[in-house]
């Protein structure tokens, strides 16, 4: 009887050890960032609760491509094989593409790659590429804003500030689809973020870049590449840009750059129709400029902190 009792305890102990070893690793939110004038490189913020953010000191990727060698609007996503892909704006004007690099630990990065995006040589700019992994078609979708003078009704905007959204796709960052028009909402538009809520249920957060609006709106679609519904009324005040969306609990947080006030704003929503301003409930370090939020393991954060301390 005693022997059986010891056997039972041993089995119970091993079961507990096995359960502990297979429990999921703790996750954190990480926010890609840059500081003006955007020539230093990639920075990170991190958060445990999605509300309160701390910086991880240091530069983790210095820009080395493009006419101006900038790193603005860093957008990141994790794809198959636990590989993180980063895209960014390389110049204010003059480049016909955007930057790309990949990493498994957010510290050691591949050689930087200029992805050619626009074939029309009159294109003024390629701004704010946003990367999204489409798990249905198993491909990456990159959306950005460009001005092509004379191509669209400019309204009150100048030809060099009359943006529309374009996109391309890739599975391997070696072969790319042709560039296509992503969205022409009838006004100058930049800073588009795709959010998947459910199968055949996608949300697009975008910036109406016309004067005096300069604010954020919403559109809906059954596909990540549209077609999209007519853009909603604005859900932020004027001079808002660079949105990023993350899910905290059962609600979505939309962080955005209130660039005239030089602070970060945040909205909370469960349906992308009704919004609650939670700007006073969140904390963002000074100097942070807009990137994107994703979730990473505790070991990734630990590695970044260790690298920062060197």
Segment roles from a protein language model:
Residues 20-310:
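Carbohydrate-active catalytic/glycan-binding domains of CAZyme proteins
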Residues 1-25:
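Bacterial Sec-dependent N-terminal signal peptides
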């Amino acid at each position: 009887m005693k022997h059986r009792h010891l056997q039972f305890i041993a089995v119970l102990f091993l079961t507990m050890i096995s359960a502990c070893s297979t429990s999921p690793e703790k996750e954190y939110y990480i926010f890609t960032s840059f500081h003006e004038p955007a020539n230093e490189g990639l920075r990170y913020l991190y958060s445990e609760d999605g509300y309160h953010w701390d910086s991880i000191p240091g530069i983790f990727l210095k820009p080395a491509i493009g006419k101006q060698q900038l790193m603005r609007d860093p957008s990141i996503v994790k794809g198959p094989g636990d590989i993180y892909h980063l895209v960014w704006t390389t110049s204010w004007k003059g480049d016909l593409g955007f930057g790309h690099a990949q990493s498994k630990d957010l510290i050691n990065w591949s050689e930087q790659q200029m992805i050619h995006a626009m074939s029309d040589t009159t294109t003024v700019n390629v701004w704010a590429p946003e990367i999204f992994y489409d798990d249905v078609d198993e491909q990456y979708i990159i959306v950005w804003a460009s001005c092509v003078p004379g191509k669209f009704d400019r309204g009150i905007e100048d030809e060099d500030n009359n943006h529309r959204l374009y996109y391309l796709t890739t599975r391997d960052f070696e072969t790319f689809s042709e560039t296509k028009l992503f969205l022409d909402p009838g006004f100058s538009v930049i800073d588009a973020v795709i959010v998947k809520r459910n199968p055949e249920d996608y949300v697009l957060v975008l910036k109406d870049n016309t004067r005096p609006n300069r604010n954020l709106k919403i559109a809906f679609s059954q596909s990540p590449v549209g077609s999209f519904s007519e853009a909603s009324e604005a859900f932020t005040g004027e001079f808002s840009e660079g949105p990023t969306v993350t899910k905290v609990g059962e609600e979505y947080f939309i962080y955005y750059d209130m660039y005239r006030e030089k602070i970060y704003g945040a909205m909370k929503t469960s349906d992308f129709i009704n919004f609650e301003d939670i700007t006073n409930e969140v904390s963002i370090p000074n100097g942070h400029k807009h990137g994107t939020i994703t979730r990473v393991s505790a070991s990734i954060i630990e590695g970044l902190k260790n690298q920062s301390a060197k």
